[in-house]
Amino acid sequence: MRAINKFLITVCIALLASVAVALGDGEETGEAEEFKVIDHSKVWEEKGITKYEGSKTCIQCHEDKVRQFFHSYHYQLFSENEGINGKTMIFGGKMAFNDYCMAMFVNNGTKVVNWIGYITLKKAPEGYEDLVGSFTGLTGCSMCHGVGMGLPPSPQESEEQLGNIDCLACHAKPDVYVSGVLGIKLGLKNVTKDDQGRWRYVINVPTEELAKSIINRPQSKNCLACHAFSGGGPHLKRPNIAPDLLNPELAAEFDVHFKAGLGCTDCHSGENHEFGTNSVDTWSREGEGAEVQQLPH
């Protein structure tokens, strides 16, 4: 019996090793390259698109996908949750208050607290910028939350709201453009004021580069540009999802999933723009998370 068990264990290890080799190294963090680049240069030229302005640009061809994402947790910041004190209720980050970022909205998600603007640290601590994931400029909660172009999300559809989504936060090759904290720090996404005096985001990447870099599904660096800084900085809210994961070598040492060649969307697939999760530290309950066994590896 021991001989049989040893044989089975050896076979399993060999199979796992072969799977890891087959997955190969991805572009950024060791994940498999299972995405496709869809060059939009020709279609943007045909439609006279000379500037990427979020979903205002994309809705011309992808209205159904824009509406899908508009109603998602990533944009609205709330979803229907079951099992809260035995009840089903609408809740999410839009209504919440915590010790990290305090509150984005008050009055049950109806009044904005600090959505967008621009502040800098007058006197940053010595060596501050050398810390992984640190930065001296802040643009408010919208820097990560809402995946938008600057306007606070509204549950009511309107032309302005449907044009307020930053589609390329997830659908651009991350070596060309990322959103979130990382995008702000790298100067890829800046704040300005529109003709009504409202703060808005503008993308500081040449349009022709963006058009050639559109991908069909997010890569892990797209996700980490926001999620690695949850709570306002590195290792604050979720020590297991940190800027270290942006470095392929550190990621392999830090996380078993990245080491095995997995990426975020291998489990959180984003089908219909719903990124399933059952984590106890998030309110998002849209879609189904990947089924995880007791010994999944």
From Swiss-Prot:
GO molecular function: metal ion binding; oxidoreductase activity
Protein keywords: Electron transport, Heme, Iron, Metal-binding, Signal, Transport
Domain of life: Archaea
The UniProt record lists the keyword Transcription regulation: no
Residues the record lists as binding heme 1: 58, 61-62
Binding sites annotated in the UniProt record for heme 2: 141, 144-145
Keyword Transmembrane helix recorded: no
PTM: Binds 5 heme groups per subunit.
Chain spans, region Disordered: 277-297
Positions that bind heme 3: 167, 170-171
Family annotation (Gene3D superfamilies): Di-heme elbow motif domain
Residues involved in heme 4 binding: 223, 226-227
Signal peptide start and end residues: 1-24
Binding site for heme 5: 264, 267-268
Family annotation (PROSITE patterns): MULTIHEME_CYTC (PS51008)
Name recorded for this polypeptide: Uncharacterized protein AF_1237
Organism (species): Archaeoglobus fulgidus (strain ATCC 49558 / DSM 4304 / JCM 9628 / NBRC 100126 / VC-16)
